């Protein structure tokens, strides 16, 4: 049974939380053992990974998610403990999620912007270790700078990952900018190979390379590269990290945009291949107004990746999801959004088997808006008057209380499952 820790919530939020608790006491059958990995009779699980030499903990993470997804959908949040609207420290001990519901996200998202120099989003090693110590799952996306223009930075987005100058071909072996890409990968590998817990064991990471490649806003997008060129970039990067740099604690994720024509053929057009991918995902953002069609599309895409993952021995996820940024930044909201999302997913026999969904960050000062203003940029409703009064905090708390969502305390034995690996 999952309850909201009301001691940390203001009076209005406590009222809703107490209502949720009362419902639970009167018979809400929340799964007390949603993490089946905590059962005492667990037998070794056979896994086949991109890296046949992956660490025991990395293999266990994969096996855990394969089983966990049959029982619940884990909640993830980018910059869970390093950015927020209600936190006073960014040392990995506080989060907006925790302040809203009394628990951390199960999946903690970060990015190479905290790994590759100049670490624009701040170093995260200590925070990752804290998340891992409490049994959380770590995922890292890759906003690599444009290798072709990274020395020309000045006016945004020149030189960043959002610089749409085509650079895929020039970043591959034989290309003029391959050494630049290798430099990024070298820093990722050094970070991964030194990311260890207190016992000196490597901490597993779901590494999400070159996401949203079916759009055209990154230098690796569909207008910047052919499907074959993109596949070569993805494969090269995995091979370099795994075989050249000896990274043994990565699961590799592939995450295009959602498709409106939801077919396996469309998903596979730029897919690097089963040999190179452990996790199948997709990224999707939708409107506040008239969003019924978008929610149906989310379910359709989730069902597709779940079926494909089942057939291919992979893990299906929604790697990014949320209200589109322009609506958030305009101050628009949907105080049923989280409930619509979980209701739609769990009602579909395939979509309900995604392992996790992840929403984007809660920028503490927002982002630059028109005429020198700062506008909102957050995806987890915070425990503050604005979100209490507009009903979005209540919506998120209802999502938390749903029997089919899993947060940090709901998952156990993530890294202790016995496994046998297929080579």
Curated annotation (Swiss-Prot):
Residues 1-27 form the signal peptide. The record marks 211 as: Plays an important role in maintaining the position of the catalytic nucleophile. Keywords: Carbohydrate metabolism, Glycosidase, Hydrolase, Polysaccharide degradation, Signal. Gene3D superfamilies: Glycosidases. SUPFAM superfamilies: (Trans)glycosidases. Changing residue 320 to A: Does not alter the affinity against carob galactomannan, azo-carob galactomannan, mannotetraose and 2,4-DNPM. Lack of activity against all substrates. Optimum pH is about 7.0. Its EC number is 3.2.1.78. Changing residue 162 to A: The mannanase activity is 95, 70, and 30-fold less active than the wild-type against mannotriose, mannotetraose and mannohexaose, respectively. Catalyzes the endo hydrolysis of beta-1,4-linked mannan and galactomannan, but displays little activity towards other polysaccharides located in the plant cell wall. Preferentially hydrolyzes the larger oligosaccharides and has greater activity against non-substituted polysaccharides. It displays tight specificity for mannose at both the -2 and the -1 subsites. Appears to act in synergy with alpha-galactosidase (AgaA) to elicit hydrolysis of galactomannan. This is Mannan endo-1,4-beta-mannosidase.
């Amino acid at each position: 049974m999952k309850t909201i820790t009301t001691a940390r919530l203001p009076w209005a939020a406590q009222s809703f939380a107490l209502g949720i608790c009362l419902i639970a006491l009167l018979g809400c059958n929340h799964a007390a053992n949603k993490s089946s990995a905590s059962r005492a009779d667990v037998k070794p699980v056979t896994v086949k990974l991109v890296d046949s030499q992956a660490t025991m903990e990395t293999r266990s993470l994969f096996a855990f998610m394969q089983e966990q997804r049959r029982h619940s959908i884990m909640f993830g949040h980018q910059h869970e403990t390093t950015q927020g609207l209600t936190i006073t420290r960014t040392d990995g001990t506080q989060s907006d999620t925790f302040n809203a519901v009394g628990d951390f996200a199960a999946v903690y998202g970060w990015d190479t912007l905290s790994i590759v120099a100049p670490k624009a989003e701040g170093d995260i090693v200590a925070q990752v270790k804290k998340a891992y110590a409490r049994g959380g799952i770590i995922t890292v996306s890759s906003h690599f700078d444009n290798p072709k223009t990274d020395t020309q930075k000045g006016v945004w987005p020149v030189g960043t990952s959002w610089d749409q100058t085509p650079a895929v071909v020039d970043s591959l072996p034989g290309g003029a900018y391959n050494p630049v890409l290798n430099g990024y990968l070298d820093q990722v590998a050094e970070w991964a190979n030194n990311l260890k817990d207190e016992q000196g064991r490597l901490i597993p990471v779901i590494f999400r390379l070159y996401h949203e490649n079916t759009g055209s806003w990154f230098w690796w997008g569909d207008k910047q590269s052919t499907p074959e060129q993109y596949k070569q970039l993805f494969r090269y990067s995995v091979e370099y990290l795994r075989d050249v740099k000896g990274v043994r604690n990565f699961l590799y994720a592939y995450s295009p945009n959602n498709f409106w024509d939801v077919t396996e053929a469309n998903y596979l057009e730029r897919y690097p291949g089963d040999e190179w991918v452990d996790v199948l995902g997709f990224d999707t953002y939708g409107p506040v107004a008239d969003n019924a069609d978008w929610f149906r599309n989310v379910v359709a895409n989730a069902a597709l990746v779940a079926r494909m993952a089942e057939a291919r021995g992979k893990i299906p996820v929604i790697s990014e999801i949320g209200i589109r940024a322009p609506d958030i930044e305009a101050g628009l909201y949907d105080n049923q959004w989280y409930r619509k999302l979980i209701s739609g997913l769990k009602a579909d026999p395939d979509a309900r088997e995604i392992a996790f969904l992840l929403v984007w960050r809660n920028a503490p000062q927002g982002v630059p808006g028109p005429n020198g203003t700062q506008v909102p940029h957050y995806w987890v409703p915070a425990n503050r008057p604005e979100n209490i009064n507009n009903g979005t905090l209540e919506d998120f708390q209802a999502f938390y209380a749903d029997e089919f969502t899993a947060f940090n305390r709901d998952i156990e034995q993530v890294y202790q499952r016995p496994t046998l690996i297929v080579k």
